[in-house]
């Protein structure tokens, strides 16, 4: 597989857009069967450059995320990125997750702070990371992964200080080692 930063660079140099898809882990075996049997084969006809797989609130789909990324890469030959969040993980646990990702041939990680499950407030895990920039730095020091970070053009929901502070947080992620920044296509589509 390829590093996503190299895919972006190649497309930019060629003056072409990068096409990627983001998938959520399945809730049922039937959903998984439909995804791999029908949905993904149909989407592959669009010629995506890569895909990413989300992590679930509070890391609730951790095992499934890595499994899906590995299967997309192995069965479809599509470069794929795993989302990874800080929430509810110590540094040691994150290290173990990264070991597993590397063992599965996963080369690209989207480093996120993460959202707590519905109804819960964000709280740093003791021995864990408080900010996505710390996770980015941990990944960079470890080596071996292409690193994506999240950007929030309309401002992060938890950043009360305003857009300028948001931009400073984004610059911090880049300075800590992020290779590229992803944003959502729509924040407010009304």
Residue ranges and their predicted role:
Residues 26-29, 48-67, 115-127, 178-190:
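Glycine-rich, proline-tolerant flexible connector loops at the mouths of alpha/beta enzymes
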Residues 18-35, 80-92, 148-165:
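Active-site mouth loops of central-metabolism enzymes
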Residues 9-14, 40-47, 66-77, 98-106, ...:
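Acidic (Asp/Glu)-rich catalytic clusters
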């Amino acid at each position: 597989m390829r590093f996503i930063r190299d895919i972006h660079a190649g497309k930019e140099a060629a003056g072409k857009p990068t096409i990627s898809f983001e998938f959520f882990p399945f809730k049922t075996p039937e959903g998984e069967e439909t995804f791999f049997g029908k949905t993904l084969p149909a989407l592959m006809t669009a010629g995506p450059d890569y895909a990413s797989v989300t992590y679930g609130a509070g890391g609730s789909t951790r095992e499934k995320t890595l499994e899906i990324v590995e299967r997309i890469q192995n069965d479809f030959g599509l470069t794929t990125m795993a989302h990874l969040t800080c929430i509810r993980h110590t540094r040691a646990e994150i290290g173990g997750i990264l070991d597993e990702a590397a063992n599965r041939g996963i080369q690209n990680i989207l480093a996120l702070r993460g959202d707590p499950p519905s109804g819960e407030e964000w709280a740093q895990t003791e021995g864990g990371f408080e900010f996505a920039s710390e996770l980015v730095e941990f990944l960079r020091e470890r080596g071996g992964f292409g690193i994506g970070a999240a950007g929030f053009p309309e401002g992060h929901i938890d950043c009360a200080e305003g857009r300028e502070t948001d931009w400073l947080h984004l610059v911090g992620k880049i300075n800590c080692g992020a290779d590229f920044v992803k944003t959502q296509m729509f924040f407010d589509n009304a």
